[in-house]
């Protein structure tokens, strides 16, 4: 059995490059979601966010573990910006598949806020998943094909949330 997660945290190239390497992540693709333009493209994606769709094996990596890594590799305290990229396309967002994912997302955001690991309050949006418009082939696995390409996503050493007593998410 597999599950799906959809996350937005700035330019999708860097997000995909780091997340696809996580054990238990089976497949990723980048695209656009959360906006108003049908059949979104790189040149015409309206109010959509650049996002990554993740297919994962929940017996190998939990949804909360994906979210914790997501919060480690991008700045969730800056609205509509990651690195040099500015605008609503680069916002931080979690698009949940069901009420359980929504609950886990909201709890994880509260834990990130309480941890003090980011200097500002988390501004990550939590919204229901809608249509996901796949980006063109030139954007898929971009940093795998062009390893010297642009990214503003990096794992932050030592950045981990305190372990929860009741794991299982």
From Swiss-Prot:
Domain of life: Bacteria
Enzyme class, UniProt record, top EC level: oxidoreductase
The EC number(s) this enzyme carries: 1.8.4.11
Catalytic residues (UniProt): 11
A GO term, aspect molecular function: L-methionine:thioredoxin-disulfide S-oxidoreductase activity
Swiss-Prot/TrEMBL keywords: Oxidoreductase
Pfam families associated with the record: PMSR
GO biological process: protein modification process
Catalytic reaction list: L-methionyl-[protein] + [thioredoxin]-disulfide + H2O = L-methionyl-(S)-S-oxide-[protein] + [thioredoxin]-dithiol; [thioredoxin]-disulfide + L-methionine + H2O = L-methionine (S)-S-oxide + [thioredoxin]-dithiol
Annotated function: Has an important function as a repair enzyme for proteins that have been inactivated by oxidation. Catalyzes the reversible oxidation-reduction of methionine sulfoxide in proteins to methionine.
NCBIfam families associated with the record: msrA
Similarity remark: Belongs to the MsrA Met sulfoxide reductase family.
PANTHER family with a match to the protein in the record: PEPTIDE METHIONINE SULFOXIDE REDUCTASE (PTHR43774), PEPTIDE METHIONINE SULFOXIDE REDUCTASE MSRA 2 (PTHR43774:SF1)
Protein name stated in the entry: Peptide methionine sulfoxide reductase MsrA
This protein's encoding gene: msrA
């Amino acid at each position: 059995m597999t599950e799906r997660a959809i996350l937005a945290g700035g330019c999708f190239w860097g997000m995909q490059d780091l997340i696809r390497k996580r054990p238990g992540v089976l497949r990723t693709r980048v695209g656009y979601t959360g906006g108003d333009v049908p059949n979104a493209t790189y040149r015409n994606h309206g109010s959509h966010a650049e996002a990554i769709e993740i297919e994962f094996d929940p017996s190998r990596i939990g949804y909360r573990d994906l979210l914790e890594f997501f919060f480690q590799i991008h700045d969730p305290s800056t609205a509509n910006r990651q690195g040099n990229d500015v605008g609503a396309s680069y916002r931080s967002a979690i698009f949940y598949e069901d009420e359980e994912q929504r609950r886990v997302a909201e709890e994880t955001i509260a834990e990130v806020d309480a941890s003090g690991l980011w200097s500002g309050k988390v501004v990550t949006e939590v919204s229901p998943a809608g249509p996901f418009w796949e980006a063109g082939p030139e954007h898929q696995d971009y940093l795998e094909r062009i390893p010297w390409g642009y990214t503003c996503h990096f794992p932050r050493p030592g950045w981990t949330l305190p372990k929860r007593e009741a794991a299982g998410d």
